[in-house]
Amino acid sequence: MANRIKNTPRDLPPLSRLEQRVMGIVWNLGECGSSEVIEEFNRTERLAESTIRTVLANLRKKGYVELVPTIARQHRFRPAVSRENVGKRTLRDLVSGFFGGSPRQVLSCLIKEERLSDEDLEALRKLIEEQQGKGK
């Protein structure tokens, strides 16, 4: 089966926190039924099955998931957009909305507020060095 994941979520409406959590489960599972999403969600937090089914229906309406053709009566879902591209768009929205468009402010906040390991800091240094030559 061909990869049907769309490359860009630019025209899709933003996700609520609950939709983000459910979408994370769908991305992790790949193709899945609502019962699998419910089971996975309830490992960390209890939520009514009907609520999760409603969230899945809303994600479908928004274009984040699509139905998988099946002969069974149960709906099966798969991601319609990639996690990476939704993450990039979400980060761009965060940078422009909360940090005045400044990546420097985002990185400053991240470094000051999070406990970054030496390994994480070294990886950030390498990324910065790579970008310095590109003029970005």
Language-model regions, residue ranges each:
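Short alpha-helical segments that sit at the start of domains
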Residues: M1-M23, K134
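Short, cationic-aromatic polyanion-contact patches
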Residues: P14-L18, T70-R89
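Short capping segments at the starts of secondary-structure elements
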Residues: I25-G33
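Short acidic, hydrophobic short linear motifs in intrinsically disordered regions
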Residues: C32-E40
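Short helix-coil junctions and helix-kink-helix linkers
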Residues: E39-E49
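Short, hydrophobic-biased segments on the C-terminal half of alpha helices
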Residues: R53-A57
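Glycine-centered, phosphate/nucleic-acid-interacting loop/turn motifs that mediate DNA/RNA or nucleotide
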Residues: G63
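Amphipathic alpha-helical dimerization/coiled-coil segments
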Residues: V86-K134
